[in-house]
């Protein structure tokens, strides 16, 4: 009997608002990152961004049904990037489950990989006001002999770091991986890997780090402790930020919710979606990729008095359990097909963990210094007070590509 050997998959999402190849095989398609970038990357990336948004909504709906009264925070982009990279090593029904579950099925395999390459290239950015870092790493046992083609594609398409590791020394391997993730997320996500199962021969990690500043920062002097209404008869006290500004705002009568966008400096925007009282479930059930485009079409500039709670929440998810409920199971089973990673060993994903942290305050992300003020037209301000459960999306404007997705049920943590 062939002994099964485990792959570990760890995904770290961090937001500090203060983680059957039947198309042509195209063996030389990704020989150089430049060629990938030129190969329909932009068009494919926009299509992929829409599918990734749909996957994110589907994932939030699943998590919300399991935990109707809890906070949810995750990075759909981080999760889908890691599994897309892993799909380079999958075949047959194992590959098809990934394509179906992550909404890749309307695109060819190579279009998906070209799109991720383009997104990684565009999203990784650093300016004085904004820093986004999205990346991957493969920690491989020194004795594993992976297929060179898989390694080449993981490196050239996903820019994955390759780290040779001694999985016979599990304690030091665990420390090395946690040190790596902590470094990549600027010490925001620590101790990601709690343990490593014996028999593990490869661990795939994906991380995402985002730091930025609100285009117009909130004045800390305006922040006051106020009530947040979790449910009927239950409230918590939270520090509530306030600002009057000119914002894109809309109301969706079909889903009974108000939409407000607050931009960061650069090309990133936060969308806050506040359901009417008692309409949170209706809103969650109505989430789909088309709804985002609908909201964008409804938005118009308004002077708004906006109240936003300061936040610090952390979420950890067993993605093996969650994805299995979305029909992605073979990759975790002994009968899965990951022979494009290594034809000499039987492999399965033994563990998949996603951890994300959200911190939001007056300055934006990670407390960058600075200030700003808007010149506002003379009109009676609208009101948007996030004092009951709401949804939040952080997205890149150009695609648009959803980076983070949250349901804030209790901002006190």
Curated annotation (Swiss-Prot):
User: Could you tell me in which tissues this protein is expressed?
Assistant: Expressed in visceral adipose tissues.
The signal peptide, as residue positions, is: 1-20
What functional role does this protein have? Adipokine that modulates insulin action by specifically inhibiting its target protease KLK7 in white adipose tissues.
GO CC annotation: what is one? extracellular space
Chain ranges passing through the membrane = none
What PTMs does it carry?
Glycosylation slightly decreases affinity for heparin, but otherwise has no significant effect on KLK7 inhibitory activity or thermal stability of the protein.
Q: List the disulfide bonds.
A: none
Q: Note the Pfam families from the entry.
A: Serpin
Instruction: Cite the domain annotation text.
Output: The reactive center loop (RCL) extends out from the body of the protein and directs binding to the target protease. The protease cleaves the serpin at the reactive site within the RCL, establishing a covalent linkage between the carboxyl group of the serpin reactive site and the serine hydroxyl of the protease. The resulting inactive serpin-protease complex is highly stable.
Encoding gene, per UniProt annotation: Serpina12
In the record, biological process GO terms are: gluconeogenesis; lipid biosynthetic process; negative regulation of gluconeogenesis; negative regulation of lipid biosynthetic process; phosphatidylinositol 3-kinase/protein kinase B signal transduction; positive regulation of insulin receptor signaling pathway; positive regulation of phosphatidylinositol 3-kinase/protein kinase B signal transduction; regulation of cholesterol metabolic process
- What ranges does the record give for the region Reactive center loop, renumbered to this chain? 364-382
What GO molecular-function term can you cite, just one? serine-type endopeptidase inhibitor activity
Q: Where in the cell is it found?
A: Secreted
Q: What is this protein called?
A: Serpin A12
Q: Which residues are glycosylated?
A: 92, 267
Regulation acting on activity, per entry: Inhibition of KLK7 is enhanced by heparin.
Enumerate the Gene3D superfamilies for this protein.
Alpha-1-antitrypsin, domain 1, Antithrombin, subunit I, domain 2
Species the sequence originates in? Mus musculus
Binding partners and assembly: Forms a stable complex with KLK7.
Record InterPro entries: Serpin_CS (IPR023795), Serpin_dom (IPR023796), Serpin_fam (IPR000215), Serpin_sf (IPR036186), Serpin_sf_1 (IPR042178), Serpin_sf_2 (IPR042185)
Which family, according to the similarity comment? Belongs to the serpin family.
**What PROSITE patterns does the entry give?**
SERPIN (PS00284)
């Amino acid at each position: 009997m062939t002994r099964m050997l485990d792959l570990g998959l760890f995904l770290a999402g961090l937001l500090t608002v203060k983680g059957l190849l039947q198309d042509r095989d195209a063996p030389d398609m990704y020989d150089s990152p430049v060629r990938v970038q030129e190969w329909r990357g932009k068009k494919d990336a926009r299509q992929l961004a829409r599918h990734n948004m749909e996957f994110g909504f589907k994932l939030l709906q699943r998590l919300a049904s399991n935990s109707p009264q809890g906070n949810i925070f995750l990075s759909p982009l981080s999760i889908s990037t890691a599994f897309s990279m892993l799909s380079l090593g999958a075949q047959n029904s194992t590959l098809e489950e990934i394509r179906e579950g992550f909404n890749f099925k309307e695109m060819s395999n190579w279009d998906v990989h070209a799109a991720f390459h383009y997104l990684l290239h565009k999203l990784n950015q650093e300016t004085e006001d904004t820093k986004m870092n999205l990346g991957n790493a493969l920690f491989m046992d020194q004795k594993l002999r992976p297929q060179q083609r898989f390694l080449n594609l993981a490196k050239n398409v996903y820019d994955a770091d390759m780290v040779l590791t001694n999985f016979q020394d599990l304690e030091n391997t665990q420390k090395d991986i946690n040190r790596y993730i902590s470094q990549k997320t600027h010490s925001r996500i620590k101790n990601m890997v709690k343990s490593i199962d014996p028999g593990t021969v490869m661990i795939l990690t994906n991380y995402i780090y985002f730091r930025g500043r609100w285009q117009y920062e909130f004045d800390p002097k305006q922040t006051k402790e106020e009530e947040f209404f979790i449910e009927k008869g239950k409230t918590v006290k939270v520090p509530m930020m306030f600002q009057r500004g000119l914002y894109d705002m809309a109301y969706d009568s079909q889903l009974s919710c108000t939409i407000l966008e607050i931009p960061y400096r650069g090309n990133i925007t936060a969308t806050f979606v506040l359901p009417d009282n008692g309409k949170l479930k209706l809103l969650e059930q109505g989430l789909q990729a088309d709804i985002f485009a609908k909201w964008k079409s409804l938005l118009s500039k308004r002077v708004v008095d906006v109240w936003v709670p300061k936040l610090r929440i952390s979420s950890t998810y067993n993605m093996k359990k969650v994805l299995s409920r979305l029909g992605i199971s073979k990759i975790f089973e002994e009968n899965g097909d990951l022979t494009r990673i290594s034809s000499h060993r039987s492999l399965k994903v033994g563990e998949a963990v996603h951890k994300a942290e959200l911190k939001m305050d007056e300055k934006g992300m990670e407390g960058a210094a600075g200030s700003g003020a808007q010149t506002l037209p003379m009109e009676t301000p609208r009101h948007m007070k996030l004092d009951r459960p709401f949804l939040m999306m952080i997205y890149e404007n150009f695609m648009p590509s959803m980076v983070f997705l949250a349901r804030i049920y209790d901002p006190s943590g």
